[in-house]
Amino acid sequence: MSMANKKNKINFLCSECGDDFPKWNGQCPSCKEWGTLSEFKVIGKKRISKNDYRAYKPLNDILKEKPGDRISTSIIEADRVLGGGLLPGSLLLLGGNPGVGKSTLALHICSGIQKPVLYISAEESEEQVAIRANRLNISSDNLHLSSENELEGIFNHIDRISPSLVIIDSIQTIINSDLDSLPGSPSQIRDCGQKFLETSK
């Protein structure tokens, strides 16, 4: 792929509303909060040659490949909500208040999938997740645990394992070191989410 990097630039990000600006202000021009702008580095965009654009396919050719074969979670209600199971290439956000059981549900889904699964738990160690899984009577040779919170490290795990499902618990704790901002900031969540989406496709 032939690409030429443009020069990186400095912007200022509001920690309240997530808007960014080319110049620093004491007050955010968007949400009017004071002292919320902090400096972050914007990585220059890459120029892509015409030969590097994504290919296209005729609809009938795609249908011949039988897309949409979903992966069952082995949980009837979860499969029903998901339209029959997990759709390969999709990115799903599991939301809810703290303590409602998001991580527990994610572990149960992982245990029911008969293919390699990668569970990234940046909030807990591998041992803590394993103890919780044992308490829930969850045991699986297909489930791989990691407490990695660096985006590049997560992608290295994905390359090695080639999992059919990746759980990120949670995206607020993941950091892309190319960005000069803290984990959980709007710029980090937006950038990491976009890269996870591109990878899932």
What are these regions (language model features)?
Residues K201:
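Helix-to-beta-strand junctions that scaffold the AdoMet/dcAdoMet cofactor pocket
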